[in-house]
């Protein structure tokens, strides 16, 4: 063919269009099941292919169109009630970065800088003792409040004062209040859970009423926070986070209405701050279900519409008030100190879940947040993770791509059912305030955190770089510094302060602090494939505690391997071979190491009982609890 001429193509059967539905016979669900059953060759379908989630429902290996027939979510369009597909027709979201304000002028300088780098939402954590008109003027100098979402957090007892300062500042600068968007994160119930403070409900709700009435002057400012992110950071499963959040929000809404606040106004002043974790599709479903269920809750109050010519008013009912305002922040629970750059991968998938799930705004925390304040590099990466999704991947141009997905629609429905069940349980017991007062919410989340830590310790829940495939030579060094606890606890129950990686990290910190780093020697011998596989497994196993790993290609005899281990001054010798060879090689290793090195046999051989009788004490395999085993070795090594 000439390189600059189109080839001549003769058309015949290729002109016929392929019709997949007509040209291929339909396959029924039963036919799929029959095929799967045959391929399993007698293995249990439920054990092998059905995912038993922590959310209280099972996930099947495949779904079909008939599985989502008559779902209440599938006929809804983006922007339509009950908003499962989003509260607006587009999927644009605010890119938020938080600033802890220690000096108003410096914070303003930083805010102006990052606004020129892609941020369009600012989160200021302000000092309650510094609040004044001059402080706000300095903090917001040069920032166009009509173009930037402004969010604030301060002491709950100063929140109403902060609201008044903002109203006065906006009026002085002649801003159009209909173009101002932002929030004040007033949430005393969050303080009760985090700090163990004992507050009276009447006092809390009276403060809430005052700030809501003050904020009525700013129609698009939300001033009541529902900080479900605190539950997420404490290890909550998605159904728990959502169910408690609904009860939390309803506690504020019902209490405000009971105190005479207009229902529509009260609902429009509540903002939900969720965490977003690494369970990718479940998180997308969580945000979809959250918008759906909150719309149903607010609808039950029949809020009256106060706006003239509102397109969403039906029979005088305000459907705008039923739209959840949803902010998301990447979870702290699954972030790690060691191999911290993996946190970038975690926050990237979390940002994807949140954006595809239709959040209003999103904060991606810097990858180094577990051990230090973000610096210029880590904050830039965190911003760019969102900008990449917008500018390169166009996630903001596609609204609810999960809509119609057999899998995600099913997850949404099932997760909503579990969350609704929990919501009703809380309501039946007197509401969310009562549940945190008696400590039942904190107790439930502590139990969940304990389960997740146990799953991490046994590798049922994997943290790359921490309990699986660690960086063998990484040293924490100056990464870790002590964190002072809050001194304002009144003795009430609190949420667990926990990260999934913390117990493994404690092992490595202890190893670093030891006088000498333990050496683990891989005595590889016999069957090539098995010895390599078990050496790799064992190396990863012991590296999780920060031990020095000495791997080897193989030895001709156990004697040669033990001699090499002693020459290397090994503390632990791991025998890596095949099950069939352990009956002989294991006994030899036991005799040669007795009373000197710690001998570990990699695997679960059939001859394990015989080896134990001969003196073997330590075996590691895929069923071993990694954390507890490593704690035991630390104890043997006096670490």
Predicted regions and their residues:
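Glycine-rich anion/phosphate-binding loop at the beta-strand->alpha-helix junction
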Residues: 249, 273-374, 381-382
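Mobile "lid/hinge" segments at catalytic clefts and subdomain interfaces of large enzymes
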Residues: 211, 216-255, 345-423
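A glycine-rich phosphate-binding loop feature that marks nucleotide/adenosyl-phosphate handling sites
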Residues: 50-58, 185-189, 227-233, 268-277, ...
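Short glycine/threonine-rich loop-to-helix capping motif typified by GTGT followed
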Residues: 236-243, 277-289, 331-344, 372-382, ...
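Intrinsic disorder at enzyme termini
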Residues: 14-29, 48-51, 57-83, 360, ...
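Catalytic alpha/beta active-site cores
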Residues: 13-279, 283, 304, 309-310, ...
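Short, Lys/Arg-enriched N-terminal segments with co-localized hydrophobic residues
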Residues: 1-12
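Conserved phosphate/anionic-ligand binding catalytic regions in large, soluble enzymes, centered on
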Residues: 52-61, 113-121, 342-368, 403-407, ...
């Amino acid at each position: 063919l000439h390189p600059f001429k189109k080839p001549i193509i003769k058309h015949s059967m290729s002109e016929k269009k392929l019709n997949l539905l007509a040209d291929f016979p339909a396959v029924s669900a039963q036919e799929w099941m029959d095929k799967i059953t045959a391929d399993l060759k007698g293995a249990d379908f439920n054990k092998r292919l059905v995912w038993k989630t922590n959310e209280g429902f099972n996930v099947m290996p495949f779904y079909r169109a008939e599985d989502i027939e008559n779902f209440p979510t599938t006929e809804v369009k983006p922007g339509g009630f009950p908003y499962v597909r989003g509260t607006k027709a587009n999927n644009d979201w605010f890119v938020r970065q938080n600033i802890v304000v220690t000096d108003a002028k410096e914070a303003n300088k930083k805010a102006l800088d990052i606004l020129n780098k892609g941020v369009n939402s600012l989160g200021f954590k302000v000092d309650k003792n510094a609040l004044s008109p001059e402080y706000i003027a300095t903090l917001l100098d040069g920032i166009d409040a009509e173009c930037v979402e402004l969010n604030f957090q301060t002491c709950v007892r100063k929140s109403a004062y902060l609201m008044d300062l903002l109203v006065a500042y906006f009026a002085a600068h002649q801003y159009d209040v209909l173009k101002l968007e932002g929030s004040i994160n007033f949430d005393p119930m969050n303080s009760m859970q985090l700090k163990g403070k004992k507050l009276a409900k009447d006092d809390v709700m009276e403060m809430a009423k005052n700030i809501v009435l003050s904020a009525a002057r700013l129609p698009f400012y939300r001033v009541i926070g529902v900080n479900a992110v605190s539950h997420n950071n404490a290890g909550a499963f998605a159904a728990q986070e959502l169910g408690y959040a609904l009860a939390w929000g309803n506690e504020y809404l019902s209490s405000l209405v009971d105190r005479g606040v207009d229902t529509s106004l009260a609902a429009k002043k509540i903002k939900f701050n969720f965490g977003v974790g690494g369970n990718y599709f479940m998180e997308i479903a969580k945000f979809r279900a959250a918008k759906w269920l909150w719309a149903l809750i607010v609808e039950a109050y029949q809020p009256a519409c106060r706006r003239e010519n509102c397109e969403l008013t039906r029979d005088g009912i305000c459907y705008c008030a039923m739209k959840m305002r949803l902010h998301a922040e990447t979870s702290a629970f699954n972030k790690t100190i060691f191999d911290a750059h993996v946190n970038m991968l975690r926050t990237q998938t979390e940002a994807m879940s949140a954006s595809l799930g239709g959040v209003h705004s999103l904060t991606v925390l810097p990858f180094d947040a577990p051990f230090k304040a973000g610096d210029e590099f880590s904050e830039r990466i965190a911003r760019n993770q969102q900008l990449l999704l917008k500018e390169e991947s166009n996630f903001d141009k596609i609204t609810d791509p999960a809509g119609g997905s057999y899998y995600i629609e099913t997850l949404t429905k099932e997760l909503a059912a579990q969350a609704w069940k929990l919501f009703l349980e809380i309501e039946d017991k007197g509401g969310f305030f009562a549940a945190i007062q008696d400590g039942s919410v904190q107790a439930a989340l502590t139990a969940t955190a304990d389960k997740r830590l146990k799953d991490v310790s046994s590798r049922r829940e994997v943290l790359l770089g921490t309990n699986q495939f660690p960086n063998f030579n990484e040293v924490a060094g100056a990464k870790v510094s002590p964190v002072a606890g809050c001194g304002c606890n009144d003795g009430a129950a609190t949420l667990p302060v926990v990260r999934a990686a913390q117990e493994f990290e404690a092992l490595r910190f202890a190893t670093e602090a030891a006088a000498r780093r333990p050496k683990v020697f891989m005595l590889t011998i016999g069957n090539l494939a098995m010895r390599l596989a078990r050496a790799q497994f064992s190396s990863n196993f012991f590296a999780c505690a920060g031990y020095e790993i000495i791997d080897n290609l193989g030895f001709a005899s156990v004697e040669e391997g033990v001699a090499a281990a002693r020459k290397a001054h090994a503390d632990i010798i791991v025998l890596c071979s095949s099950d069939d060879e352990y009956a002989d090689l294991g006994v030899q290793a036991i005799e040669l190491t007795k009373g000197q090195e710690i001998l570990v046999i990699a695997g679960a051989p059939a001859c394990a009982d015989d080896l134990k009788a001969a003196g073997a004490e330590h075996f590691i395999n895929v069923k071993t609890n990694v954390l507890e085993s490593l704690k035991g070795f630390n104890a043997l090594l006096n670490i």
